[in-house]
Amino acid sequence: MKHISMFARRAAALLLAAVLLIGAIPAAFAEEEGTPEGEAVTEAVYTVPTTIGGADTTLLPAEEENCLSWLFGSKDTITMPYLNIKGKGLRRNVKLNLVDCLVGITYTELGSIGSFVSASAAQEAWKAQAVAIHSYLEYHKKYGSSANALIYTPVDQIPASARSAIEKAVRAVKDEVLTYNGSVIDAVWSASAGYNTQTGVYGTCSGLDAWGTDVPYLQSVESPYERQYHEKMRRIIGKDYTYQEYNDSKTGEPYVSADTTHKDLGGFVQYNTFVSNGRSYRNISQFVSSRYCFDFGTDANGTPVMTYYGYGHGVGMSQCGAVGFAAEQGMGYREILQHYYTGVSMKSVGSGSSGGGFFGWLRKLFR
């Protein structure tokens, strides 16, 4: 009786598979042929009760999976609830080949370094970037949050030489992610870390100083290879006044002043210090460095100026620093990552399931 029941289930599954396959093949070929000119394309829209950047996510088009991909499955894929695709914008339900996904985002983030560092240094920097990207994606996927800050460049838009070189690096690390206490981390990064003019030390900003949240693996660490962004960028505060002239014109109000003595390792000012006309500022608009990483002084004419360093939030891995460590010290990607993310471990997440899709389900049924 048991064998008859098993036989009946298998027969029913095979019959269902045949029906679905017959219906899927014409649809798959139609997908390849494209939509006839002038005919509107209808895309599925799911109800998602959230917004991204103020935009209603229910209005975002979803990336649709090819029928044959669903039937046969794919060995190495990653599905993101939201992802920016170059040339398309923000999309929902994005399912990509894992290697292509990591290559496309790595190229967007760090694609140009192959032209100014050695091939071996570029490989290690790309590996570090790919592992950080994979970890970031898995973290945001796990918690259902958006990875819309990243931009995926479709691999067919990447120059062949760059694609080949980056893909070599990605394939070597595609199964690796960063973990802390066994859980995948939010592996944030920025273009460049800051510079502490008091100590002469370049360094990153901690999660606590940047966002008010103490994250054990996002601590402030030294990042010595930031020269590319060490050119002073300034915003003039009170263009038409010297300090004395400005303060004399504001009788009874607080002077223009700034205390930059309380800094973390990277030179990021740790709390409200800048005062202008009685107001304190935590974040000042129009700065390319979104954290405090500045000195306050005057130019040759006595005009108040603010000088700041770095590019980006300065938390986690510095791309400039990672390239420098690889090029100047010969560091491998593991050393680079473990330097920037305090106390982390590397973990293999496997290469995906070669038994995916509907037929993967069938194979499990017959085991």
Model segments located where?
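Conserved, single-site charged/polar hotspot
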Residues: 2-367
